[in-house]
Structures are given as structure tokens and as C-alpha cells.
């Protein structure tokens, strides 16, 4: 169990402040090294000038302490000072999954997307079994372990919440294009809220497109509330029926009708080895959605 030490991080770790690994609303992540062992780690430096900000970091530490899964980033140590808190976490160097979506030279096959989606669902299932909602799932919050392997870890539990069935939880934060309809409506959130985001991520991995993104936030939120999306774009040509059904079962406006992480992992798209074998041999691993020149 990690608790925030009121000691100087420099006594234990060398933090390379010149190298920024990532950042967000919280601050920045730097590469660091444990002085005693030489172990490479990542230091997330969070500005905490108010009691509320400090409590938010303590919540993040508390949540990360409860999670132990190969597809979730692990907390290693924590430090607290007057103006900031520093979380020391395991280091991975494969970059954001988002980078692979937008990289024109990196074409994902449907089988690649299945591999990524399965791991996302496995990480989410573990969180949900521990009664934790992530509430900020998006490609920027999924890191690849290295440049070559298709292994991922979910990061950033800064907005995560413990789910207590008797306490009806409402939230009003997140990134517009990944918000579930119940967040937009300021309605109660629960496990299906994360599964909507998994649906958006899967859609993006398959196509490079964002299903609800409008010209501005208002249009994006209206698209979400109307549940206005389809798989008719050229990028989805060649997508298996199982893949289409999988996305459809997640991007469902009524949250009680969405499949859970456990159900997603049993869905044929993620679980049927015969389908995976067919996709492996089919059309020499064409990118998901790419048109086969032999197709009439």
C-alpha cells in the first residue's frame, strides 16, 4: 500500500525534469530513476495548492492502491509537499494508443484492434470487479508497453471514483467526445458509463474516426444525446459482422442495455478463435476498413 511521504523525492529518486513523457490537466509526467536500484519509473507531478486538490490526489492514490492488473498502470511510491504531490509509477515507453490511431503509416488490422480492445476490457473488468469507475477512458489514457508489442496499460485515475450502489453518483467532467449520454444529461453513472467509452475507443481504433465529434462541443454533445453514429463510412468496409455487433452493443444510449466488460470479453468478436483465424488468413491482413482491390 502506497501512502504519500512528506519527504523530498530527491532523496530516493532522480527525476529528469527536462524530459516530459506526457501531461494533462494535472501537470506533467517525467522519467525518473530509483537511486537504490536504478529502476526506470515515471513521476507524475500534480499541482496541489488547495486542500481540495490534495484530497483529489489522495483519492487517486487510494484507488490505485486497490488495483493490481497487468493492463492497469501500477503505483510505486508517492510524495507530498506544500505545492505539489508526486506519484511514482511504472514506466512504459510505447507511447499513447492515440498516436497509433492518428499515425498514417501505422495501419491497424481488425485483429490488431481485437487485441487492443480485449486488453482494455480486461483492465476495465478488473476495475469494475473492485467497484471502481475510471470515468475518463480515451485513447490518450491508454499507453502501449513498447513500440512493437500490442500490449497496453490504462493510465490516469485522477477522475476515477469508487462506485457505491446506494449512493447515486453524478459527474460533470470528462472529454466531450468520449462522454456517455448519462454524463451529458447529468444522470447517474455506473459501470456501463465506462463501457460506452470503450465503444468510442473501439470505433476509433477500427476507423481513425471519432463517432460523435462535431464542429464544436455543443454539436458533439448533441450527437451523443441523439446517439447519432453509424458504420457506413468507407473505413468500415470489410469489418466483420461480429465487429459491427460488438460496437453496436456498446454505443447504446440506454445504459442498462450496454454489455458489461465481462460480457464483452465473452463476445465472439473478442473470444471466437475461429473468427480470429479467419481474420488472420483473410485478405493478407488488410487494414480494418481498407478496400480490397479485388472486391467488386
Q: What do these predicted regions represent?
A:
Residues 45-68:
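Conserved N-lobe beta3->alphaC-helix segment of eukaryotic protein kinase catalytic domains
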Residues 128-144:
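Catalytic-loop of the protein kinase fold
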Residues 77-78:
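A short, aromatic-enriched beta-strand patch in the conserved N-lobe beta-sheet
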Residues 116-117:
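Activation segment signature within eukaryotic-like protein kinase domains
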Residues 259-294:
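Regulatory extensions flanking the kinase catalytic core
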Amino acid at each position: 500500500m502506497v501512502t504519500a511521504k512528506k519527504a523530498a523525492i530527491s532523496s530516493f529518486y532522480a527525476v529528469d525534469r527536462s524530459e516530459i513523457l506526457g501531461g494533462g490537466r494535472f501537470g506533467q509526467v517525467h522519467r525518473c530513476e530509483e537511486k537504490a536500484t536504478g529502476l526506470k519509473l515515471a513521476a507524475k507531478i500534480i499541482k496541489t495548492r488547495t486542500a481540495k486538490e490534495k484530497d483529489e490526489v489522495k483519492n487517486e492514490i487510494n484507488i490505485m492502491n486497490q488495483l493490481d492488473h497487468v493492463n492497469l498502470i501500477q503505483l510505486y511510491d508517492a510524495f507530498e509537499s506544500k505545492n505539489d504531490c508526486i506519484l511514482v509509477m511504472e514506466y512504459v515507453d510505447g507511447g499513447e494508443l492515440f498516436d497509433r490511431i492518428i499515425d498514417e503509416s501505422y495501419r491497424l488490422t481488425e485483429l490488431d484492434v481485437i487485441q487492443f480492445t480485449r486488453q482494455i476490457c480486461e483492465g476495465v473488468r478488473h476495475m469494475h470487479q473492485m467497484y471502481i469507475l475510471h470515468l475518463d477512458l480515451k485513447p490518450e489514457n491508454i499507453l502501449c508497453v513498447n513500440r512493437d508489442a500490442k500490449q497496453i496499460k490504462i493510465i490516469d485515475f485522477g477522475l476515477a471514483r469508487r462506485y457505491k450502489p446506494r449512493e447515486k453518483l453524478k459527474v460533470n467532467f470528462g472529454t466531450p467526445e468520449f462522454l456517455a449520454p448519462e454524463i451529458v444529461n447529468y444522470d447517474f453513472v455506473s459501470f456501463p458509463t465506462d463501457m460506452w467509452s470503450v465503444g468510442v475507443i473501439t470505433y476509433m481504433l477500427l476507423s481513425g474516426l471519432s463517432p460523435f465529434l462535431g464542429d464544436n462541443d455543443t454539436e458533439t454533445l448533441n450527437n451523443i444525446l441523439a446517439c447519432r453514429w453509424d458504420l457506413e463510412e468507407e473505413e468500415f468496409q470489410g469489418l466483420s459482422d461480429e465487429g459491427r455487433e460488438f460496437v453496436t452493443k456498446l454505443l447504446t444510449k440506454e445504459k442498462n442495455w450496454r454489455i458489461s466488460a465481462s460480457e464483452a470479453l465473452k463476445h465472439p468478436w473478442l473470444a471466437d478463435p475461429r473468427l480470429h483465424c479467419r481474420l488472420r488468413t483473410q485478405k493478407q491482413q488488410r487494414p480494418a476498413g481498407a478496400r480490397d482491390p479485388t472486391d467488386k
